[in-house]
């Protein structure tokens, strides 16, 4: 009997491995139903505040930045908000790609073949800054002149990063074939590498940008970089794990403000700037002061 159980377990493991290799981990049906039920026919231009949502079109192999400002002036860029949310969450290997289309009053259509926005902008901060900096050029002012950096405040909230130091090595990767780059011991190395690199480079460039204008305090990045276990995984939505993530967030507020070292790329605590909680309070005060200033002519 023990031999049969062992064979059964082995067969189950092999079947599970091939199912992960040959298709997405989830079918996405529940997520799509939930988003459509909650958002209904609400379109992108109807959002209550300005939004910038990245996704990636695998048919044209280029990023698509959904923006409510663009949506107000171009019907083909005004999809249902549910379609946008499904698109930007369609993470390769986890959820299936998503196709939808928009139609304007002239009968013209645009077909979108979308996957997760993280493919193009895992950290969308730079995409948001770009939209704001050119906002006055699309007939919808963001109340900021292009590149008026000293009046631009950027709060970037990361969703957490796993402690990956030592996870992969060149010695090990040198022996990998195509399959191992996609799947290795439950991880997806190629996805991990591209997503982390994308996010880190954005933080590096945005940090450099504000420091070059001597207004580094206008950019506040809050990110936990030491996650491990289930809280480091992107698809564990159990009540227990969500409570753990809440505690991680509370602890993060108590940690010192950190900023990326432009030489090493590592986050380092900044002397004299207090905790993240104190920095958020100060940031709110700065925002309040900015709101009181007269609009740029």
What are these regions (language model features)?
Residues 1-297:
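Conserved catalytic cores and adjacent C-terminal regulatory segments
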